[in-house]
Amino acid sequence: MTNTPRINRFLFVLYILLTVGVLVAALIWPAVRVVAYAPLRDLLFPAFYLPTSAGIEARITVAAPPTLEAWVREAAADFNRQNTLIEVGVISLRGAEAGRRLNASVTDLPDVWIAEAGFVRTSVGGVPYESGGPSVAQDGLAWVAVASSDVGGDLSWRSVADAARSDIRFRVAVPPVGSVEGMAACASAAAEYHQQANLTADLLNDAAFRGWLDELLAAAPNRSRHPRDQLGSRPPEVDAGLILGSDWQQLAKESFIYQPPAYNVVFDFPYLVRTNWYELSEDEANARRIAAERFSDFLLGGGPQGKLVNYGLERAGAEPSVQIVSFDDPAVRALQACWQ
C-alpha cells in the first residue's frame, strides 16, 4: 500500500472539489461558462446552458448595414454552432431606411440594430433602440483615382474639385443621393474646405462651401450608382471616386491610386439593442436581451475581430491615421439636407 503524504491527499481532494464546483457553476451561470471552457461538459450536458434563469430558448434578429452584413452572417453561423438555446438571424438594413423600418409602430422589429455610425443613430431619432452601444468594427471614406488621371499623387477634396473645374471632361463618382455615405462625404468635404475637424451646422450650411461642393458634384455623371461600380467598369466610367475603405479590395488596385481624406469620418458600427419588447412576456424579453448581449460579446472576441480584414474592415477601436471629423446634433440634422 502506498504511503501517500497527507498534504498530497488534501490537495487532491481540494482539486476535485474545485473542479466539481466550477463545473456546476458553469452549467448554471453563463458568466462562469465564458471563462470555464469545457468541451467535455458541452458535449455531455449541452442543454444545461441556460441563456436566462428561466431556461427559455431565444432567437434574435440582428439588422446590419450591407457593408457589415457578410461578416455578421459568418459570425452568427459560428455563434449558432456553439450555442444550444440561442439562434441569431441576420437581415440587411441601410441607415437611410432605419427611421422608417425601426419605428415603434412596426411589428417584428429586429432585436439588434448595428448602425453604420453614431451619427446615423442620432439622425434617426425616436426609435426603440439604445442611444449608443459598443463599436464592433471600423471603416472610413477613401478617395480612389485612375492612376493616369490629372490628380496624380495629390488626391483630396480640393485636388478633385480643382481637376473638375479645370477640365470639363473630368468625371467623379460619389456616394448615392440620400445615403449615409453621402452624409459622411458632406462632413468630410466641409471639414477639408474649412480646415476644421469640429463641424457645426453653420459651417455645413455656409453658402461659399455649398457653392464649391455643388460645382464639384456637377462633375458626377451618375449619383444613383455606387461609386465602386463606376470605378470597377472596364474601362472606368470616371476619373476619381469616393468609396468606403472596405470597397478598395474589390477594385484592381494596380490601376488606381488610393488616399483617405485628410479629414475622415469613422464608420464605427455601434451595436444597439432594443430598449423594449412590448409584445413579449418579461421572461421572453429578458431572454432576448441576454442573447443580444452574448452575441455582442462574441463579435468583440478575437475570432470574429480577426476576420474583419477578410472583408476590408478594421478592428473595433483601430487607431485612425488621419483627422477624424466630429459634429454635434444640429450638424447631423444639417448633414441630412446636404447630400441631395
What are these regions (language model features)?
Residues 133-142, 207-216, 252-284, 288-290:
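Periplasmic-binding protein-like
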Residues 68-75, 94, 98, 113-123, ...:
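Stable alpha-helical elements in mature extracytoplasmic
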Residues 191-260:
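Ligand-binding pocket segment of bilobal, Venus flytrap-like solute-binding proteins
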Residues 63-65, 146, 164-205, 213-217:
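Short beta-strand->loop
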Residues 86-93, 131-132, 200-204, 307-317:
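Surface-exposed patches in mature extracellular/periplasmic domains of secreted proteins
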Residues 7-28, 33-178:
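N-terminal segment of the mature folded domain
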Residues 148-155, 191-199, 277-292:
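Short helix-loop capping/hinge motifs at secondary-structure junctions, enriched
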Residues 5-41, 53-56, 276-340:
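Extracellular/periplasmic juxtamembrane helices and adjacent flexible linkers that interface
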